Amino acid sequence: MNEQEKFIPKRDIRVDWQLIAEMIKPGSRVLDVGCDDGQLLAHLTETKNVDGRGLELSQAGVNICVANGLSVVQGNADTDLGFYPDGGFDYAILSKTLQATHQPHVVLEQLLRIGQRAIVSFPNFANWRCRSYLAFKGRMPMTHSLDTPWYETPNIHFCTLKDFTALCGKMGVTIEQTVIVDASGKVMTRTNYGAFANLFGADCIFMLSKKKA
C-alpha cells in the first residue's frame, strides 16, 4: 500500500470526536458507521483501547483505514447495517453522517439494535448562521459544518436539534446525554444557552439507548 494513501494524524482532533471519545468507556466494542478515513476510530483505539470496527461507503476511505491497520469494510449505512448481529457492539457511532442517509430513522433503529448505545452527531440546520444566510442571501447556507455547495453535498436530510429530539420521542428512544457545541467549538452549558440551544448550537451530539420495557 502506497504511503501516500495513509492519513496524516491530525494535531487537533475534531471537537465532536473529542466529545464522542469522552462518552465511551475504555475497552469497549465500537462500530463507527461512515468512518471516512478512520481518524475517529484511530483516536478511540489509541486513547480508549477500544475494539473498533468501521463501515465506510467510499472505497478510497476503506483503503486508507486498512493501510493504517484499522478493521474497516466497505458498505452503505442505509443497506448494510442489517448484516451486523444484535447487540454486537457496546457503542454504534454515526458521526456527521445521519444527514447523508436516505432513511435516518431506519438507520437509528439499526444502530440501537447493533449497539447497546448509539452516539450520533450532526450539524444543526437551525443555527442562527444558517437562518441568517438563507434569510439575507436567499441561498442554501454554507457554514463551517456545512461547507459543501448544495449541488455537490452528500447531505439530503438536514435536521435541527428540535427535529432530532422529536424523532427520538416518536421512536421511543432514550436520550442519555446531549452535548451542544457552538460555532467556535465550545461546549454550551445550560446556564449560557438555556432555551436557545437550537438557535446558537452549531453541532449536536446525542448518546441514545432503547427504552427499557
Residue ranges of model-derived segments:
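Class I SAM-dependent methyltransferase Rossmann-like catalytic core
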Residues: N2-I13
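Conserved alpha-helix/loop element of class I SAM-dependent methyltransferases that forms part
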Residues: R11-G27
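Class I SAM-dependent methyltransferase "Motif I" SAM/SAH-binding loop
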Residues: G34-D36
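Class I SAM-dependent methyltransferase SAM/SAH-binding core
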Residues: Q39, H43-D80
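Short conserved loop adjoining the S-adenosyl-L-methionine
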Residues: D80-D86
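A short SAM/SAH-binding and catalytic strip from SAM-dependent methyltransferases
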Residues: Y91-Q103
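S-adenosyl-L-methionine-dependent methyltransferase catalytic module, highlighting the catalytic core
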Residues: V106-Q110, R117-K212
